[in-house]
Swiss-Prot record:
Changing C175S: Eliminates glutamine-dependent NAD synthetase activity with the ammonia-dependent activity intact. It comes from Homo sapiens (Human). One of its GO terms (biological process) is NAD biosynthetic process. In the C-terminal section; belongs to the NAD synthetase family. It holds the Pfam family NAD_synthase. ATP binds at P355, L356, S357, G358, G359, V360, D361, S362. It catalyses: deamido-NAD(+) + L-glutamine + ATP + H2O = L-glutamate + AMP + diphosphate + NAD(+) + H(+). One of its GO terms (cellular component) is cytosol. The keyword ATP-binding applies. It is linked to Vertebral, cardiac, renal, and limb defects syndrome 3: An autosomal recessive, lethal disorder characterized by severe cardiac and renal anomalies, including hypoplastic or absent left ventricle, transposition of the great arteries, absent pulmonary trunk, and hypoplastic or absent kidneys. Patients also exhibit vertebral segmentation defects and shortening of the proximal long bones or micromelia. Death occurs in early infancy. This is Glutamine-dependent NAD(+) synthetase. PROSITE patterns: CN_HYDROLASE (PS50263). Changing C49R: In VCRL3; loss of protein expression. Catalyzes the final step of the nicotinamide adenine dinucleotide (NAD) de novo synthesis pathway, the ATP-dependent amidation of deamido-NAD using L-glutamine as a nitrogen source.
Amino acid sequence: MGRKVTVATCALNQWALDFEGNLQRILKSIEIAKNRGARYRLGPELEICGYGCWDHYYESDTLLHSFQVLAALVESPVTQDIICDVGMPVMHRNVRYNCRVIFLNRKILLIRPKMALANEGNYRELRWFTPWSRSRHTEEYFLPRMIQDLTKQETVPFGDAVLVTWDTCIGSEICEELWTPHSPHIDMGLDGVEIITNASGSHQVLRKANTRVDLVTMVTSKNGGIYLLANQKGCDGDRLYYDGCAMIAMNGSVFAQGSQFSLDDVEVLTATLDLEDVRSYRAEISSRNLAASRASPYPRVKVDFALSCHEDLLAPISEPIEWKYHSPEEEISLGPACWLWDFLRRSQQAGFLLPLSGGVDSAATACLIYSMCCQVCEAVRSGNEEVLADVRTIVNQISYTPQDPRDLCGRILTTCYMASKNSSQETCTRARELAQQIGSHHISLNIDPAVKAVMGIFSLVTGKSPLFAAHGGSSRENLALQNVQARIRMVLAYLFAQLSLWSRGVHGGLLVLGSANVDESLLGYLTKYDCSSADINPIGGISKTDLRAFVQFCIQRFQLPALQSILLAPATAELEPLADGQVSQTDEEDMGMTYAELSVYGKLRKVAKMGPYSMFCKLLGMWRHICTPRQVADKVKRFFSKYSMNRHKMTTLTPAYHAENYSPEDNRFDLRPFLYNTSWPWQFRCIENQVLQLERAEPQSLDGVD
């Protein structure tokens, strides 16, 4: 009797609405799985249409084209003699569901709808889909005629059921269901399901890779069984990077690990495992067996097929492995770089333009492009034909083969230092040296003539000439003079992005990169429509603290000594006049708080969901050894005043790589008003009362608050 099964899961770089490309990647993954002896292939969530279709899920076209792709899969000879588990949207009784469609040899076995939808953070599945709420229940689903013609089936089971083959029992759960308090795998495992599959659409967040691994290993540790997890990978059209990490686990151990960051569009994992190991593991867990004896049965779909062979005694089985994690610095180096690569090749542009200021943020962005170039060269050396074809398209040279990251960087990255009379020689030198070391095409220019021309128009119309504060001007004049410099830099960045390659006789345009970090965005410490306004921002979801650690990491990893002086220099916007040739303005002085403090505020505001009063109470304990209650109160008030005053800037924030759970990104992750009462009278009065109590004073009444 056969008992060893070979199963396959995968990570695919699908693209929203790219039905042609998605089909080819699915077919390739099935072909690879079959060639490795697998008899079951699991793919990512909604892989046929791509996970990130968003409001396109409302369109009948999306449903139609998904079924057309399914038809192409069902009739392909590649899908014969292997159970194929694919994801797509399906409408049943005029209700849209996020489904798995499982088929074998031109027959649909089961359509399994998702039962718990992700609806927090970046996820909005309840906007487009309805969860299937009828546990252990199936209905008849009438197939579209195009599928009936292929399968000769009129109806198939639709609902919460499991598959029974000659040798085992297989159950499905979909992404979010793994994370719920009462996951389907619990009851399925108790009902004798030995192989559980999970198709995911899970994106990367810094320092969170272990969460999925821990959940899967815990699932199979408590209940035994084999667990397959598939995930999407790459940028499928927006701010998220789906980080793969496909895996196969059994009885609390991992047997196959997929890459978290890779330029491979298709990655397939297989493992050969012994079903008797599951049965013997479960046999000695008496608490599990007592619960199983009372379990309600699932509807079973009988499948005339086996995952094992009769003659498998000599077949080698897979061995457990230790999961290998990336450090946060490696995650920053690899994740945004892969996201940038997908964005570049799919946008049909010829490269990037980066305003390089000589500071940490723009230097970190430059390092990400260099990291991307390193990964591209490595992929080409490894024989990745898709990456090679994409590179040749981008540089418009059909015979080009990238071998040196510096050479590739020089072809696809233009850096631009935009000096003014307020810029120091030190930042100019640092920008130039870094550009030389990464190999970018570097431009230095002076914006003073443009600033003078713009201010000349203002003076001509009004008869007034504003002054910097250092020259006796008001704070309003000072800010306006800073902002005009910043906005002219944005205009010039887009001009050079459109025409710099043309001026060099090279085909194409460039994507403009922004370099505002998550902390500055949270506080609004940026000029609206300055160089923070760009096409995309690879560091917009990363904290200043993490960026500094990443830049330090790059010094050794990429041998970029120019970064050392950038790290040592104080962060400054260089928008105010120099004092004796030296920088007179620093970011932290301008903000009135440190970047470390900003990270704390950001996590408490978003992750811990705290308003001003709750944050004050929390920080009293956290900072009790370094701040008095009065100092804590002043810091919290300053943060919320500036945050609310600048919240309107988040509505125009450049699309940024999502990396932190306290991102203020206004598109769908952090939904807040952008017109506040910035004095927060009631909230700040509550804080003041508490401070006075702690200082043993009488609290003020809340009556009559303005």
